[in-house]
Amino acid sequence: KLWSLTTDYDFEHSTCEWLHPAILAAKANSEDNPSWEEAMNGPLSDGYWESANKEVKTLEDMDVWDVIPRTSDMNVLPSTWAFKCKRFPDGSVRKLKGRFCVRGDRQKDGIDYDSSEIYSPVVSWNTVRLLLILSVVLGLQTKQVDYTAAFVHAPIGDLDVFCEMPSGFSEPGCVLKLKKSLYGLKQAPINFFNHIKGKLEHAGFKSNDTIDSCLFISD
């Protein structure tokens, strides 16, 4: 019985004893999610610096922001780095990733976001199951697509949003004026949904709001 794994045993010390050690070697820990200071001063600093450079270049190539002079009337949001060390099952490093984010928890309603326009639809699992069943019954192929840097494809919207420049790449007296929906913003999910909805509609698809607004159908 599955429940006995957690109710009858100490998972960390009993159940795991018979699991292959390689499975546990890749277990996430705080060292695999370092802060900027920890990443730049740790044993993997070269790799993290390379990932940060790659992230900034990607965002600049996508025209995510303008660098402008700071003024006293701006609500400048803090920014942060989210680093991640991905490992192979044996614990060795597979990939180092850095993502530049905005501190959306510091946004102010009516200033840099609208609290009435931040809900983003999420696909129902019933819809996913139905499509998979239909693909099997009808002998159709299914494809899964992953958007690279998904949110930052979407325009920021009407409100001005400012944030601090990335640690390691700052310019004195300057801030970023966002043009795209950087990760961390409260409105980023709905902005991306509206963006991809427009793209799908342009390609001839229509959203089925009656069943699932995340279900798009083409004639």
Please report, for each region that a protein language model flagged, where it lies by residue.
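Long, low-complexity, charge-biased intrinsically disordered regions
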Residues: 1-219
